[in-house]
Regions:
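Transmembrane-helix motifs of polytopic, lipid-linked glycan transferases
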Residues: 105-126, 160, 164, 168, ...
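Perimembrane helix-loop-helix junctions
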Residues: 4, 171-177, 201-234
């Protein structure tokens, strides 16, 4: 009888394992297919590189391998490096780089993995495929998720790391195993190399592992191992900033940091907790919808009832980080429904979505009818107004019109006039999109990221400045340099100007060297 009972238990275990694997495999197939369709849709709509940040992420990855000074130094200082490193296999292909697909494809893979880890985590937390399906649908089918997962932005990579951390910590809570702990450490390390809110997750996760571990010695050893791996991300970034820029915190207080960009200009929420919460919640309503936010809040209570304390705490951390950033870290969030009635950083409200999705998964764990009703209610705004673009798509469109006009007109003007392998003095900024559209290798551009060569060219132009063209914004430092250089040599003549209302003009200069004529040959000379 005992053998028969053990046999039945073994069969049940194998059956459950097979069922779990099959459900995850089906989820993976659906997620990858969904994101492939999203990439194709936004590419056909021409929206892949609407965000200026998307253009910049793509070109940072490209310049690591295609620059006058290629290598690790081209990663820069403000944005964390992992997304750019993951784009490297794709940006090597010129056509993928020129179209932006080199950044869209890895982002779509990351967003698919995020949804798969969410499915697995919710299934394990509530023991319900229905709950996992509902949570995954609410997350992946959000129009903003589809857009941000189909363009070269960092949100997809962070969501993948966050949900991997969720899965491995939920698994650790059940098994107390070293494999789950190692998975959690790798996941949070990846998060910390993707976005700064990943750093915020490390101490909370360490405390969770310490509290939920088994045995005093095993707990301490586990936390030490976790912290050793998890802290590699911040340690690498601090060392990178110290080595290349002379300051461990250059990313935080350098000229390209959020604090430097915002300066002392006031904005709603700065040093005001109530206003910070108000603006962030308003952005959340636009990005996720009020019904979904309400369901997420109710679902969080349901999750606590189901004793899923840690997942709720973990998924609350990113929204709390952003409210803190609005209040204390020079990070404004503007929405069209509140003063100054514009778009800026609205995508940060997507940090609400993991908690909302998990909460709806908790509601769905009570049965199929609650699951269907919760999912339908969450998507009510989309169903009522299917013609409206997502808030992130709107933001990227509105804020990129000047840049797209600059890039398009400049590229159209240059295409029939530039020769093969001609070189450009320029800045690594929005203007880099011109060279991407034209297929000009970034090694044919000279920018401030080329260190010694750029310094030599700008401090002694007659000797070291040899580019065929210069493309600058009116009034910037390079335009001033060209005016100064005209007094001696080389001379750059303004040949075209692109003007956009309310923006500085883009100016294209062509080098006009005075080449002295050779004397005629004199046969009488010896």
């Amino acid at each position: 009888m005992a053998a028969s009972k053990n046999s039945r238990n073994s069969r049940r275990f194998k059956s459950a394992l097979t069922s779990a694997a099959a459900s995850v495999a089906f989820c993976a197939l659906a997620c990858f297919a969904t994101m492939a369709c999203a990439v194709w849709y936004f590419y056909r709509a021409g929206a892949t590189l609407y965000y200026g940040d998307a253009e910049a992420h793509l070109n940072i990855a490209r310049r690591i391998i295609d620059s006058r000074t290629p290598g690790w130094s081209q990663i820069g200082t403000t944005w964390l490096p992992l997304p750019h490193l993951l784009m490297l296999p794709f940006v090597r292909h010129e056509r993928l780089w020129m179209t932006g697909l080199a950044g869209a494809i890895p982002a779509a893979i990351a967003m698919s993995l995020a949804a798969i880890f969410l499915f697995a985590a919710v299934r394990r937390a509530f023991g319900s495929v229905t709950a996992a399906t509902a949570a995954t649908a609410v997350f992946l089918l959000n129009p903003n998720t589809l857009y941000l997962g189909a363009i070269p932005m960092t949100e997809a990579y962070f969501f993948a790391a966050l949900f991997a951390l969720l899965y491995f910590t939920v698994r650790f809570d059940e098994t107390r195993g070293w494999g789950a702990l190692a998975g959690a450490a790798i996941a949070v390390c990846a998060a910390s190399l993707t976005r700064y809110e990943g750093w915020f997750l490390i101490p909370f996760t360490a405390v969770f592992l310490l509290v939920r571990g088994k045995g005093v010695v095993r707990r301490i050893a586990g936390v030490l191992v976790f912290c050793s791996v998890a802290s590699l991300g911040p340690a690498i970034w601090l060392a990178h900033n110290r080595f290349y820029f002379g300051d461990f915190l250059y990313f935080f207080r350098g000229p390209w940091s959020a604090a430097a960009i915002q300066g002392k200009t006031d904005y709603p929420g700065r040093d005001n907790w109530q206003m910070a919460v108000h603006y962030y919640f308003e952005a959340g309503k636009l990005a996720i919808g009020l019904p979904a936010l309400g369901l997420g809040a109710g679902g969080a209570v349901a999750a606590l009832y189901r004793r899923a304390f840690w997942p709720v705490l973990l998924l609350m951390l990113p929204p709390l980080f952003y409210v803190w950033s609005i209040h204390s870290s020079s990070t404004p969030v503007f929405v069209p429904t509140l003063w100054p009635n514009s778009f800026y950083n609205t995508r940060y409200a997507m940090a609400f979505l993991p908690l909302v999705a998990f909460g709806i998964g908790a509601i769905a764990s009570f049965g199929r009818i609650p699951a269907v009703l919760a999912v339908l209610l969450a998507f009510t705004p989309v169903m009522l107004h299917p013609e409206q673009h997502s808030i992130t798509w709107q933001e990227s469109d509105v804020n990129s019109r000047a840049r797209r006009q600059w890039v398009g007109e400049a590229a159209d003007w240059l295409k029939p006039r530039m020769g093969p392998n001609e070189t450009f003095l320029t800045s690594f900024s929005d203007l880099t999109g011109i060279y991407r559209e034209l297929g000009v290798p970034l090694r044919n551009t000279l920018t401030g990221d080329n260190d010694v060569e750029f310094v030599m060219a700008t401090t002694n132009p007659p000797v070291f400045l040899h580019t065929d063209w210069a493309i600058v914004l009116s009034g910037d430092d390079l335009q001033t340099l060209l005016d100064r250089a005209r007094r001696n040599a080389p001379k750059y003549e303004l040949v075209h100007r692109v003007t956009v209302k309310g923006e500085p003009a883009l100016e294209i200069y062509k080098r006009e060297d005075d080449v002295p004529e050779l004397p005629e040959h004199d046969d009488t000379l010896p």
